[in-house]
Amino acid sequence: MSTIEEQLKALREETLASLKQITAGNEKEMQDLRVSVLGKKGSLTEILKGMKDVSAEMRPIIGKHVNEARDVLTAAFEETAKLLEEKKVAAQLASESIDVTLPGRPVATGHRHVLTQTSEEIEDIFIGMGYQVVDGFEVEQDYYNFERMNLPKDHPARDMQDTFYITEEILLRTHTSPVQARAMDAHDFSKGPLKMISPGRVFRRDTDDATHSHQFHQIEGLVVGKNISMADLQGTLQLIVQKMFGEERQIRLRPSYFPFTEPSVEVDVSCFKCGGEGCNVCKKTGWIEIMGAGMVHPRVLEMSGIDATVYSGFAFGLGQERVAMLRYGINDIRGFYQGDVRFSEQFK
């Protein structure tokens, strides 16, 4: 065995033994060892200087041993570097591990606004009664908002609703009734009656105070079919009120006037605070006004191409804010819109 071969064997054994001694976190020690063995001025280079003394016949053999030693040592350094990196990552993960036995921190969650809750509850009542929920436009044509509701341009009842006009013919809707007009236009009555509600935001030129707002929410209902009577309306209203305010509640109908219904009524509900005895909530009357209603005016039906001698219907409308204020004892409508978290958190 030549001297060079002995040197190569010794270098391999010493280097591999040194690599096994290097621990995680000592990457610099490994790098220094690599330079001292495989670098330009390293041990392997020094051994190669002895090739000049090797005979021509032995040089290919010794050269092969040198290349094998270089390959083995290079692979050993790469494998050691990989193992050190894996140990480093494992140690880092262990130091950053989460103790799942520690108590968690509660996450603050939001909740639906009280008006959204009220609207969804009312919609669920009607869906359970077979009504469909129909949405419509907030920016509406004067024709659908007024004329289709039996309110021509010169009708004095238009003064009852101060309106936000965008142009002479375009406005912010003052009620959700235009949705009903379009629904009557589109409905195929040969397939059965129309039963729908139209919830949404409406706008009127009111001065904002504790009981008025320039924008508020309405849910209007409409049923049109054959042989629809005032008794059907009264039974429907009684059922709605009991589902919203309790089974013990009763209703009272008072004559009123709306251009799009005839006859028209105001609907009162027996006071849920005093049971009809008289208190500050019902202003000592025992009754609380809750909504308006009536039988659909024949002229409104005819404008949708519906034969008023064959078909009839009833309509009603109530405000979500009004319902929420009564149910939760809220005395200022502005609380719904001011974004005060202290107000909203009461209705989680």
From Swiss-Prot:
Belongs to the class-II aminoacyl-tRNA synthetase family. Phe-tRNA synthetase alpha subunit type 1 subfamily. GO terms for molecular function: ATP binding; catalytic activity, acting on a protein; magnesium ion binding; phenylalanine-tRNA ligase activity; transferase activity; tRNA binding. It is found in: Cytoplasm. It comes from the Bacteria. HAMAP family: Phe_tRNA_synth_alpha1 (MF_00281). This is Phenylalanine--tRNA ligase alpha subunit. Its cofactor is Mg(2+). The gene is pheS. Keywords: Aminoacyl-tRNA synthetase, ATP-binding, Cytoplasm, Ligase, Magnesium, Metal-binding, Nucleotide-binding, Protein biosynthesis. It holds the Pfam family tRNA-synt_2d. The lineage of its organism: Bacteria, Bacillati, Bacillota, Bacilli, Lactobacillales. Coiled coil: none annotated. Binds 2 magnesium ions per tetramer. One of its GO terms (biological process) is phenylalanyl-tRNA aminoacylation. Its EC number is 6.1.1.20. PANTHER family: PHENYLALANINE--TRNA LIGASE, MITOCHONDRIAL, PHENYLALANYL-TRNA SYNTHETASE. Its main location: cytoplasm.
